[in-house]
């Protein structure tokens, strides 16, 4: 039996993940992360490319360990500002048929009931 490879994209609902200043494609649109069309276009591109899914990461705070300050994270836009990944999944799912979705979530900072309600509504 042959094994199939799965292709999954990794993204974050912010301007940059943890690689600011690295080479980027001239057609990169990540600065449009606040526009819903950016996310629906991305979902359609991934589906046309036969990706199995997309994982949208999240972080629940600002990195403030380096030099005991958040200054470098803020000036470098390192995962900040970041938006809730759960808000874009329904729109992305509405424009695709086969793309799977995964998101970072946490019940450490919120009550389990509203968390379960939100996830079950997706």
Segments from the language model and where they lie:
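N-terminal beta1-alpha1-beta2 module of alpha/beta enzyme domains
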Residues: 1-96
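Generic hydrophobic, aliphatic-rich segments that mediate packing or membrane embedding
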Residues: 84-88, 92, 103, 111-118
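Short, surface-exposed connector motifs at secondary-structure boundaries
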Residues: 96-102
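Short His-Asn-centered micro-motif
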Residues: 57, 103-105
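Glycine-rich anion/phosphate-binding loops
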Residues: 30-39, 107-121
């Amino acid at each position: 039996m042959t094994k199939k490879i799965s292709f999954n994209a990794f993204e974050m609902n912010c301007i940059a993940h943890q690689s600011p200043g690295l080479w980027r494609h001239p057609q990169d649109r990540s600065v449009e992360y606040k526009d819903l069309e950016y996310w629906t276009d991305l979902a359609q591109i991934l589906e046309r490319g036969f990706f199995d899914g997309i994982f949208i990461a999240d972080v629940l705070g600002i990195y403030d360990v380096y030099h005991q300050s958040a200054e470098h994270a803020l000036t470098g836009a390192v995962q900040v500002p970041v938006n809730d990944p759960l808000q874009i999944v329904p729109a992305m799912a509405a424009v695709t048929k086969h793309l799977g979705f995964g998101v970072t979530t946490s019940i450490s900072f919120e009550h389990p009931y509203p968390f379960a309600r939100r996830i079950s509504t997706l």
